[in-house]
């Protein structure tokens, strides 16, 4: 997508990618999107770890060392970003979303745009039990989530922390006694039925009016600690339609969002969670035509009429992550739908 001649670009455009860590491929794809809108823009990365992979990879002028977010007051974070002339901020980690959501309005007054959902929906997506109670009647059934396994009519379970991601503490396919034993290791455990099946992610970009601009589907063919290390895009019109309705039925979602879904052996969809942020395999979505970064910038510049309502996404684009290196290519074979 080229930069239209009528596009009015504020100067300077300096985008900060927070919690950069080792997300080099994501940073590079963000740079591509930004440059399509403004070739003169600068994209910085930031992290509280001065020795992170991102700090070693980026030029020193493009990396900022930050304190831990909880150490900043609202005024201090405004002052920090203003001092570095930041015009846009893109969070990349679950644990920081609440902070940026709570400070979004204050930053907006300083002409700093943040790609983040509203605080109440961030809290909803962080709380798995409340998320289930609020979304179990929507277009796609949420996986049953309970504070006790006795309320679940299954023989095997998944045990997780109620709040946050915590993929490294999850217990999968456990019998009831094993599930209860695993739960003792967690702070606030919740229980879900174990549902065997294929898993996919559905990614979208949601504008400030709550409209979802296209649904990009990708199979999660190899997952390590909750992150896709192998993934490939595919299409299914019925699933895309229902997932679009799902996203649009949750007020307050904004920016890049993704849903994790399991397809059961019977072919029904079970919603696992919604992450209102860029994900670890999002470089694949950005490569396949989900230009969230471009659209975030266009919306912030009151150029929403240039954002396509129904983008065309490329099928068969594949991501492989090995030894921290991400490669993206077009698969020679088109992925089949699950039956």
What does each of the following model-derived ranges do?
Residues 97-98, 166, 279:
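Short glycine-rich, flexible loops that bind phosphorylated cofactors or substrates
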Residues 40-42, 211, 268:
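Residues at the starts of beta-strands that form the adenosine-phosphate
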Residues 1-115:
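ATP-binding N-terminal substructure of ATP-dependent carboxylate-amine bond-forming enzymes
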Residues 119-197, 208-211, 237-241:
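Active-site nucleotide/adenylate-binding loops and adjacent lid/helix of ATP-dependent enzymes
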Residues 304-339:
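Cysteine/selenocysteine-centered motifs that mediate thiol-based redox chemistry or coordinate metal-sulfur cofactors
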Residues 173, 192-252, 256, 263, ...:
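ATP-dependent carboxylate/phosphate-activation module, predominantly the ATP-grasp catalytic core
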């Amino acid at each position: 997508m080229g930069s239209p001649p009528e596009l009015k670009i504020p100067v300077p455009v300096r985008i900060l990618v927070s919690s950069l860590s080792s997300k080099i491929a994501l940073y590079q794809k963000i740079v591509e999107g930004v440059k399509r809108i403004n070739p003169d823009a600068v994209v910085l990365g930031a992290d509280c770890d001065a020795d992170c992979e991102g700090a070693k990879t980026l030029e020193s002028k493009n990396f900022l060392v930050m304190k831990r977010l909880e150490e900043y007051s609202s005024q201090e974070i405004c002052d920090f970003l203003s001092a570095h002339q930041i015009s846009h901020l893109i969070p990349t980690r679950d644990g920081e979303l609440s902070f940026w959501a709570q400070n979004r309005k204050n930053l907006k007054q300083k002409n700093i745009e943040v790609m983040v959902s509203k605080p109440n929906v961030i809290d909803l997506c962080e709380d798995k039990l409340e998320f289930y109670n609020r979304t179990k009647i929507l277009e796609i059934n949420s996986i049953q989530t309970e504070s006790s396994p006795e309320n679940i009519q299954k023989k095997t379970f998944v045990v997780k922390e109620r709040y946050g991601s915590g993929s490294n503490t999850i217990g999968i396919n456990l019998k009831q006694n094993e599930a209860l034993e695993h739960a003792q290791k967690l702070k606030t455990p919740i229980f879900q039925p174990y549902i065997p099946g294929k898993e996919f992610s559905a990614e979208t970009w949601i504008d400030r009016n709550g409209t979802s601009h296209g649904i990009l589907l990708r199979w999660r063919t190899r997952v390590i600690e909750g992150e896709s290390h192998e993934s490939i895009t595919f299409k299914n019109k019925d699933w895309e339609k229902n997932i679009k309705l799902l996203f649009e039925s949750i007020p307050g979602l904004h920016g890049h969002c993704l849903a994790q879904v399991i397809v059961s052996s019977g072919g029904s969809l079970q919603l696992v969670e919604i992450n209102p942020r860029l994900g670890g395999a999002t470089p694949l979505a950005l490569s396949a035509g989900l230009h969230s970064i471009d659209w975030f910038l266009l919306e912030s510049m009151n150029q929403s009429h240039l954002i396509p309502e129904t983008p065309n996404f490329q099928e068969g684009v594949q991501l492989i992550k090995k030894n921290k290196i991400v490669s993206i290519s077009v698969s020679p074979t088109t992925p089949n739908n699950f039956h």
